[in-house]
Every structure is written in C-alpha cells, then in structure tokens.
C-alpha cells in the first residue's frame, strides 16, 4: 500500500438484494478496495471483492439480510485492511429517494433519516435497504457518526420544470401527497454529464445532453444548459423504458383489467410489473442482456424482446430532442447495457437516421468493456459511450459535504 493513504471515503450502495462497497480516494480517483455481496435472502449469499489488485470470492451463508452482510463486510473484509480502513474520513451512502424535501446531498442527521423513512412508499425496494446501511454503519463505527453523507438519486432532478414533473391527474394529488415525477439514477446521469463536459471542453452549465443509463434498471434524462429538464422514471423507478424485470410505460388501465377481470391482488400486480415484466416478461427466459446478445439472431423471443426495448428507447431519444433548444452537444450511453452492448446502440440509432444520427460501425463495436469514446460519424450528432462510476461520484459528493462542515 502506498504511504499517501489519507482522506479515504467508504461508499455503500445497499440495493434490494445486494450491497456494493468501495473505499476510494476521491481526489486521485483510486479505488483501494471494492466489492459486492449478492443474493441476499436467497439460499446462497456470496461476496466478491478486490483489494490492491487481488480478487477474492466467498460464500458467506444462506438467507442473509442486509445487517448480517454489512457486519460481515466490516468485520471480515474492511477491518482486515487496517492501513486502508484507518484512513477513512467519511462514509457516503447512496439513497434512492429523497422526495420533495431533500434537494441535495446531505450530512445524515435525524431529519434526513426521517425523510428517508417518509419516502419508503415511493421506493419500497431501496429506501429500507439504504436506511439499514446507514443505521448499521453508524452503530458499528460511532467515531464517524457525524461524517455519514446521504447522496440522493433524486436530487439531480430537483430543478425540473413543472411541465415535466407534474402528472395530468387532479392537482391536489401533488399538493397534498407530493405525487410527481422524481426520477432515479441521478448520480449516474450527473457523473457522465460532468465527464462529457471535460471531453468536449465545455462548461457544464452550457451543455445540452441526452443521457441514457441502461442496466437492470434503465432511464434517460434530458439536460439543458446543465439542468435536467426531464427524465423517464417517475414517482417510482417503474416508469419509462423497458428494463430487466420492470415494465416501464404501460396503459394504467392494464392494472384495472388485471384486478377486475383477472382477479389478481394489488400485491400480485405490483410484483408482476416490478419483478416479472420487462425483458424477462417479454422473453419468458431471462433479464440478463448477455442472453439477448447471444440469442438475438437465433430465437424469435430474444429478437422480439430486444426490438421492444429499442423501439421504446429510440422513441424517448427522439422526443427528448424537442427539449434541446436548437442544439444537441451529445447523446451518452452508460450503465451495464449502455457500455457493453453495441447491438443496442446500432439498432436504436438506425431508427434515428432522420434526426441526424449515423453510427460508425467500427467504433461502435470496439467501444465495449468499460471503454469510453465517440461512436458516430463526423456528419452525425455526437454519441458517446461513457463508463459510469457511481461509487466515485458518491465519494466526491461525500468529501465535498464533509469539507463544508
């Protein structure tokens, strides 16, 4: 380990069935340790981590919950790396929903915790996990209890105009219950937007961008003069694009039909739209894009699923062009699918030729596996692939907030 280890940040991202963790230096952008616990609540929970170029893998039990897994991470992984662990000066937590109240990254106090609890109803899979992460770490590591920062996925969208965030339902639902578009993946959309400002050598607040975060969850954002003006996810992360297991946009009356005609319960319907739909629902086989890439030319169900996915995405890109005020600086693809699946980019932009997009096939095929770069011809609107790094983004926000104290 080099001797310049100081001012490190521990980043925690507690998902519904996984926990990602990393220790990094936000200044030199170096990751000293990173890992993931996967398959919580299932028969085999396991952990993979990487420390100083060495990789580790371990099965750690069955039916583990978030608290068990966090205790394992801290006791068995982090504390074994004393010289790294002892230089942590702050902890950054990804929190999915801050609702209408929390506009930006915040030091965690009782008020912030109350807000995270309050908005569990809008992020039932994520906010409870985020909360357990925060509470466990504060309990395990009281010396840093006032150095925990919540970085919200919703804060990037707090300046959207009413025309974007209001739903056309009685206005009272917004005034009384805060029902509106909130968006998600804000940390990733913001990170790649800042990255492109460096690549293009333009001020962030002069940029017009369309950013596409495509992973197991998928969302798209329109950014005008550095401000997000629209995004595809809504009150919850269920709206918008086709996703791994989520439906994205549907006619709301489908829900009434399932309830009344098919006698399904609300819980069943919610589970179907969140866990059994999207690519998994369309194909009946998988939500993993590696399957679709292999099978696209071989099976009808894979082709069908990918075509629905691309149809929806190209429609959103086309509609967001209308928000660009006469200039588009770049379209960005990021996330596991956005960065790695050249097929999707090819299919999506072949539909957008009329709007001035032309993919360079060679660049498109070679820009995968964490590589970033331009994938279009010089005559086209620029499309870039940019590898996202949510952990680094959270670490940078965390140190900024801690230094403000």
Regions found by a protein language model. Give the residues of each.
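Short beta-strand-loop/turn "lid" adjacent to the catalytic site in phosphate-handling enzymes
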Residues: 77-126, 147-149, 155-166
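Glycine-rich phosphate-binding loop of actin/hexokinase-like ATP-binding domains
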Residues: 158-259
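Glycine-rich phosphate-binding loops at beta-strand->alpha-helix junctions
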Residues: 329-351
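Phosphate/pyrophosphate-binding loops at sites that engage ATP/ADP/AMP, CoA/4′-phosphopantetheine
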Residues: 75-89, 140-141, 196-203, 317-329
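Adenine-nucleotide phosphate-binding core of ATP-dependent small-molecule kinases
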Residues: 271, 278-282, 289-324
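Gly/Ser/Thr-rich active-site cleft segment
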Residues: 93, 123-192
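Short glycine-rich, Thr/Ser-proximal phosphate-binding strand/loop in the N-terminal lobe
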Residues: 18-63
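Structural signal for terminal/edge beta-strands and the immediately following C-terminal loop/tail
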Residues: 370-405
């Amino acid at each position: 380990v080099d001797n310049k280890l100081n001012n490190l940040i521990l980043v925690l991202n507690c998902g519904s069935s996984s926990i990602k963790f990393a220790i990094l230096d936000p200044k030199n952008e170096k990751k000293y340790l990173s890992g993931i616990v996967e398959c919580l609540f299932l028969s085999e929970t396991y952990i993979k981590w990487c420390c100083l170029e060495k990789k580790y893998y371990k099965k750690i039990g069955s039916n583990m919950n978030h608290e068990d897994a966090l205790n394992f991470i801290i006791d068995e992984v982090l504390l074994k790396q004393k010289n790294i662990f002892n230089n942590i000066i702050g902890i950054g937590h990804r929190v999915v929903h801050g609702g209408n109240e929390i506009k930006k990254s915040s030091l965690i106090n009782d008020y912030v915790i109350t807000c995270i609890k309050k908005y569990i109803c809008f992020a039932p899979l994520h906010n409870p996990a985020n909360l357990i992460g925060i509470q466990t770490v504060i309990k395990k590591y009281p010396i840093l209890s006032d150095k925990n920062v919540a970085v919200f996925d919703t804060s990037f969208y707090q300046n959207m105009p009413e025309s974007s965030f209001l739903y056309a339902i009685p206005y009272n639902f917004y005034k009384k219950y805060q029902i509106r578009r909130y968006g998600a993946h804000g940390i990733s959309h913001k990170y790649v937007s800042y990255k492109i400002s460096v690549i293009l050598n333009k001020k962030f607040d002069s940029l017009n961008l369309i950013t596409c975060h495509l992973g197991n969850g998928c969302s798209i954002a329109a950014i005008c003069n550095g401000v997000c003006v629209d995004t595809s996810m809504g009150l919850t992360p269920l709206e918008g694009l086709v996703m791994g297991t989520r439906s994205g946009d549907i006619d709301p009356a489908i829900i009434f039909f399932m309830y009344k005609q098919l006698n399904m319960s609300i819980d069943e319907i919610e589970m179907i739209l969140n866990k059994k739909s999207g690519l998994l629902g369309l194909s009946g086989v998988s939500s993993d894009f590696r399957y679709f890439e292999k099978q696209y030319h071989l099976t009808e169900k894979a082709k069908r699923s990918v075509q629905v996915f691309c149809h929806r995405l190209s429609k959103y890109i086309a509609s967001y062009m209308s928000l660009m005020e006469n200039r588009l600086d770049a379209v960005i693809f990021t996330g596991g699918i956005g960065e790695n699946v050249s097929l999707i980019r090819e299919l999506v932009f072949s539909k957008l030729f009329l709007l001035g997009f032309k993919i360079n096939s060679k660049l498109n095929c070679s820009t995968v596996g964490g590589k970033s770069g331009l994938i279009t011809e010089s005559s086209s609107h620029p499309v870039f692939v940019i590898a996202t790094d949510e952990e680094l983004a959270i670490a940078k926000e965390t140190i900024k907030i801690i230094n403000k104290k």
